[in-house]
Amino acid sequence: MRQGAPARGRRWFVVWALLGLTLGVLVASAAPSSPGTPGVAAATQAANGGPATPAPPAPGAPPTGDPKPKKNRKPKPPKPPRPAGDNATVAAGHATLREHLRDIKAENTDANFYVCPPPTGATVVQFEQPRRCPTRPEGQNYTEGIAVVFKENIAPYKFKATMYYKDVTVSQVWFGHRYSQFMGIFEDRAPVPFEEVIDKINAKGVCRSTAKYVRNNLETTAFHRDDHETDMELKPANAATRTSRGWHTTDLKYNPSRVEAFHRYGTTVNCIVEEVDARSVYPYDEFVLATGDFVYMSPFYGYREGSHTEHTSYAADRFKQVDGFYARDLTTKARATAPTTRNLLTTPKFTVAWDWVPKRPSVCTMTKWQEVDEMLRSEYGGSFRFSSDAISTTFTTNLTEYPLSRVDLGDCIGKDARDAMDRIFARRYNATHIKVGQPQYYLANGGFLIAYQPLLSNTLAELYVREHLREQSRKPPNPTPPPPGASANASVERIKTTSSIEFARLQFTYNHIQRHVNDMLGRVAIAWCELQNHELTLWNEARKLNPNAIASATVGRRVSARMLGDVMAVSTCVPVAADNVIVQNSMRISSRPGACYSRPLVSFRYEDQGPLVEGQLGENNELRLTRDAIEPCTVGHRRYFTFGGGYVYFEEYAYSHQLSRADITTVSTFIDLNITMLEDHEFVPLEVYTRHEIKDSGLLDYTEVQRRNQLHDLRFADIDTVIHADANAAMFAGLGAFFEGMGDLGRAVGKVVMGIVGGVVSAVSGVSSFMSNPFGALAVGLLVLAGLAAAFFAFRYVMRLQSNPMKALYPLTTKELKNPTNPDASGEGEEGGDFDEAKLAEAREMIRYMALVSAMERTEHKAKKKGTSALLSAKVTDMVMRKRRNTNYTQVPNKDGDADEDDL
């Protein structure tokens, strides 16, 4: 009874409120309507159940007389209607309402109308009580800090070494008359003794010309150039590499002197000092030189600081350690300023030397991989997860720390980690955070060692300090000391690191997505629950004002509802097709002046051929079966009503035009759900070991070995000089040695004699070489043949002169004498008659004068050579001779006849 009293009070309050509202409506309806109110006559027929006025034209339709409508032009609102007394004028001035409604239905074909009968109370519902919302999931035990990640050091230990050896070459040559042939070449490499390295090479920059070594358990000695022992100067190599230098004593190979048809031997000893790179890998029991030579001794072996326990495979007399050794630069002859401890080892092929250093500070089995400024440590079950956005990686470790004492040769880990952490802290966190304790070390999956320094902000640090002081005051004064570490006597081991980091990156991706999704779903669930509880309170109050809308939104379909105390009675609404609904164009009540309908009147059919039902348009396309929504008519009336998929606009209680939903600005009532989308995260390329590290991890660099072996001849030998075998070399060598023993005078005489002999030998050698050349022999043969041919023709000509001088000297004249057509010929031939004595005398005279002319020309030619006086004498002689001779002959014409040309 106590609980029902307030409810009855509220119901009586509602009843009295409705009664007062009804009286107000009646008083307002009794007032006369405005004389200028349009549409009264048009609405009268519709209100009395008459036919509705046709609908106005659709928006955007052009007038009847305009053949070219403009596109995208909104229809102009119709002119204000005339007074209600002229219904025909109103119908003619306005477009029909039915055409407008057809256009709206065509644009929104999915809009339906509903007829909702009043609920009877047969079905009642109630709202659920507010639920208890879940709490937001708390995060894990997160700790921020600085981390340095270490990986296995696969790089070898590198150091500089010096090789001392002598290349011994013994060549056997057989000399023929025109060629030389190698019958055998023996090459070997001998080590340099310790004394020669220290006293000769390092002290003076010289090397002995002999090589003493053991082969097949026999000690043998090789002499350079097959001569006695001397000191040879070391000179830089021809082509030095970027990583090493070299020195040697000779460029050319020594070949024996030429002695034909004999086998000769020649020995070359080339002392070579070469700086090379050496490398050794864990456990550092041996090292290899850049030349490919292995040394089966630890590079840290020695006689100091317990290094004699390191591995060695050689006898004790083959090794020597020199303290206070000052190395010398063989190029500049400069001596080092600081002494070193020098190790020297002799092998059967070479002697190697290097500077000794202790093993502990020099090598480390772990190396620094990544420095992480922000590393987040979280606890998941029985493991720690170290995550970093900078490297997109998550490492999983145990909850217990990993002692550094278990890492073999791990002295560098603590130092490198502290240096990196101090540098990062000073750069980023010095003003905002403090360090919590000492660095912690954890062994992660995959063989990564994580050095982690936890950090704490200054604000939290102050709170923790206060709480710590408070707890310390409650503890007993003498706490028990912690037990010693269980790993104090643990054996050392080497950590093996995997070459791939993909598993850690996949773990990071999974953790990133899991954390984001879980946090997002947790926030969504909490927000959704709280929102539902808030809306439930609003719905409980809103159902009292509009139970139909609240019930429809709750049930999910159109229903009608009314309150029955604290519950709602609901009834299902019947859908009506949009084509079966017609709206009236007037909202005035003709029988009651001053009263108007507050919502438009409609006529509809439940079925296409069913009877017409009169009603009133409700909210949200609801078709009310009653027309009791009445209000007093007011001036300046403007209303928009939802009709189908759009709106109809009434002005002064008369239809004006229709609008689509797009013409009305929409105000959203939805609350945006603040869900953070998964952020884009780019994975940067991350390599545990680079290609250079992997390539450099081996003990032997085959590329460097091949390069050095192929450059050896180029560096320590002259490959461009060619020595030709000379048969006279032995003779010249003997003459040179003979004159060398006679002092300075003998050397001077020897130079002259050897020069003359050399010229003669060169000339003979030149002729011999020319004759030995195929082209030279051919040329000589051709010249000999040409000489023989010339001698033959000369001999023949002389014989002709002796037998017939005239025919030999004057062959053309002789031919004319033989020609029978010549009128001067006697016609008798040589066989007929005797010669003419007169003509014979003339011929003899002509020959005598020809000899005289020839003598005069020779005299004149000689006078020209001797000078002017002789020339004058020749002229005078010529004049005398001209006066003495008689011109008893005529000059023979120079032109030959055609017959002579034919004879020729």
From Swiss-Prot:
UniProt organism field: Human herpesvirus 1 (strain 17) (HHV-1)
InterPro entries on file: Glycoprot_B_PH1, Glycoprot_B_PH2, Glycoprot_B_PH2_sf, Glycoprotein_B_ecto_C, Herpes_Glycoprot_B
Effect of V555M: In strain: Nonneuroinvasive mutant HF10
Protein name: Envelope glycoprotein B
Motif (Internalization motif): 889-892
Disulfide bonds: C116-C573, C133-C529, C207-C271, C364-C412, C596-C633
Compositionally skewed regions (Basic residues) per UniProt: 70-79
Keywords: Disulfide bond, Glycoprotein, Host cell membrane, Host endosome, Host Golgi apparatus, Host membrane, Host-virus interaction, Membrane, Signal, Transmembrane, Transmembrane helix, Ubl conjugation, Viral attachment to host cell, Viral envelope protein, Virion, Virus entry into host cell
Glycosylation sites per record: N87, N141, N398, N430, N489, N674
Gene that encodes it: gB
Statement: the UniProt record of this protein carries the keyword Metal-binding: no
A biological process from GO: virion attachment to host cell
UniProt topological domain (Virion surface) ranges: 31-774
Membrane-protein topology: Single-pass type I membrane protein
Subunit structure: Homotrimer; disulfide-linked. Interacts with host receptor MYH9/NMMHC-IIA. Interacts with host receptor MYH10/NMMHC-IIB. Binds to heparan sulfate proteoglycans. Interacts with gH/gL heterodimer. Interacts with host DEFA1, DEFA2 and DEFA3; these interactions inhibit viral infection.
SUPFAM superfamilies per record: Viral glycoprotein ectodomain-like
Bias-annotated ranges (Pro residues): 53-66, 476-485
Localization per Swiss-Prot or TrEMBL: Virion membrane; Host cell membrane; Host endosome membrane; Host Golgi apparatus membrane
Protein family per UniProt: Belongs to the herpesviridae glycoprotein B family.
Highest rank taxon of the organism: Viruses
Annotated stretches, region: Involved in fusion and/or binding to host membrane: 173-179, 258-265
Primary localization class, coarse: virion
Region spans: Disordered: 31-88, 470-492, 883-904
Cleaved signal peptide residues: 1-30
Annotated phenotype, changing P80L: In strain: Nonneuroinvasive mutant HF10
Residue ranges annotated as Intravirion topological domain: 796-904
Region span, Hydrophobic membrane proximal region: 719-772
